[in-house]
């Protein structure tokens, strides 16, 4: 993750972007940039945890650098785009919008959610899990993996999760849009090996 001042998350987002690019190119598509939604925490870092735990995040559009780029160019672009989200008011504005949608009647809320969901291919999330191993019913957990929910007709969910010093990446794909998702996973693995 030291290349171009990038974080581990930047490297993984770049690799996901490259995998999508290669997957589409192998099927004869010109891989223009595609957007995914990424959750952004809107709870202040210094805020104490509330009595009742819960998430306080907004889904923000992240244009993935899926067009044809060299690996280091793609990494630099992934970092630039991720940094842009971190310094944008979009998360706070989106959180307010999602809160308002949640208060609308069900039919209106569904239409609005479907409208916004159609702007992205899916959701990509990075979850920092426990840094040390955990036990469940006396047995040490060897790994954990999460699955990303999707909305509307979104076709691809990517969950990046770290646990006990290991990062795992899970892909969830709509079989009608990505009938050979294993090839997308192999493209990701190949990208991580370069």
Show where each model-derived region lies.
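Glycine-rich, charged/polar anion/phosphate-binding loops
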Residues: 22, 44-48, 106-112, 143, ...
